[in-house]
Amino acid sequence: MHKIVLASSSPYRRALLEKLRIPFEFHAPDIDETPHAGEEAAPMVQRLAIAKAQALAERYPRHLIIGADQCCVLDGQIAGKPLTEANAIAQLTSAHGKAVTFYTGLALLNSASGALQACTEPFVVRFRALEDAEIAGYVHLEQPLQCAGSFQCEGLGIALFEALEGRDPNTLIGLPLLALADMLRREGVNPLRR
């Protein structure tokens, strides 16, 4: 069986990958995540997912390396991690009553053969009309300062939404497991067979 490495320091991505019950290591890649001038969301997250996987290929030369990246698009603009409470409140205020699209790029690199699989999975979140006090209360309670879109859907953030639309709800948390399981099976790793 191939050894697997998750190219991420995200505890959320690690928790998602653990759902597949396959042993893996994780290591944070060191890459420049700056968007290119004029780059759109879907190509950007796919490029960064591939770059994260490729960044670990030399360190893990006989592994399947998983890279992932995510961003959210609000009003046609890429919205990054808020980093401060004020920015999180501003993002959620802009999002209330609107649809926000998340793009998650996924890459699986076989570092021994060089075979690369990559895709981008969209996921749409429809926000309820929110009151200012709800937004401020949510940000204070959950502190989603490291989360694209300023929320955690796996926690209290679910109360912000009217609807969720997408193929795989894991995509919204940062790792599309349906697509990843398909990629792993193509590399001979089936989570249902040991």
UniProtKB/Swiss-Prot annotation:
Superkingdom assignment: Bacteria
Matches recorded under NCBIfam families: maf
Protein's organism: Sodalis glossinidius (strain morsitans)
Keyword Hydrolase: yes
PANTHER family cross-referenced by the UniProt entry: 7-METHYL-GTP PYROPHOSPHATASE, BIFUNCTIONAL DTTP/UTP PYROPHOSPHATASE/METHYLTRANSFERASE PROTEIN-RELATED
Gene3D superfamilies: 3.90.950.10
Active site: D69
Recorded GO MF terms: nucleoside triphosphate diphosphatase activity
Catalytic reaction list: N(7)-methyl-GTP + H2O = N(7)-methyl-GMP + diphosphate + H(+)
Keywords: Cytoplasm, Hydrolase, Nucleotide metabolism
A GO CC annotation given for this chain: cytoplasm
InterPro entries, per the entry: ITPase-like_fam, Maf-like
EC code(s) of this entry: 3.6.1.-
Keyword Hydrolase: yes
UniProt-annotated site: Important for substrate specificity, residues: Y12, Q70, E154
Protein name listed in UniProt: 7-methyl-GTP pyrophosphatase
Family the entry assigns: Belongs to the Maf family. YceF subfamily.
GO biological process, alphabetically ordered: nucleotide metabolic process
Localization annotation: Cytoplasm
